Amino acid sequence: SISIDQKTTSRNPRSTVGTVTEIYDYFRVLFARIGTPYSPETGKEIKSMSVQEIVDEFYKFKKKQKFYLISPVVNNRKGEFKKEIAEFIKKGFMRFRIDGEVCDSSNIPQLDKKKNHSIDIIVDRIEVDKKYESRIAQSIETAISLSDGVIYFYDVVEQKNFIFSSK
């Protein structure tokens, strides 16, 4: 049952019954819950996956195909991020992708604090081969924990990201 509060209305010509009664927000939540989201780029269903499901999807790529397993930690935000990068280096991560460029911990570029930056940690360099299955699963768990649930498999040859989410 839905109740609508009676009150004075604003006279905005773009108002609808949904926006005036503020029921529009509830409909958005309702349709977001019952709907199935699809990626506008690939047309595939967007869903959360377990580590094992991500591993299974990884093995659908061609055998011997090479990937970087990437954990996005800063997504298009302003700042220098010196402390964050130093903390990741202290934890043992040596390779990064900063603003699309792969770099080593020894040659991190100086970031302009007034510009937006994207920083990804390259957690592992892997190839599609069953003998690496346990290592891949551990690396995926590590990547998920660093990035709040989103990881990329970056195809080194095609230079394309394949995005997976555990949320």
Locate the predicted segments by residue:
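Conserved phosphate-binding elements of NTP-dependent enzyme cores
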Residues: S1-K167
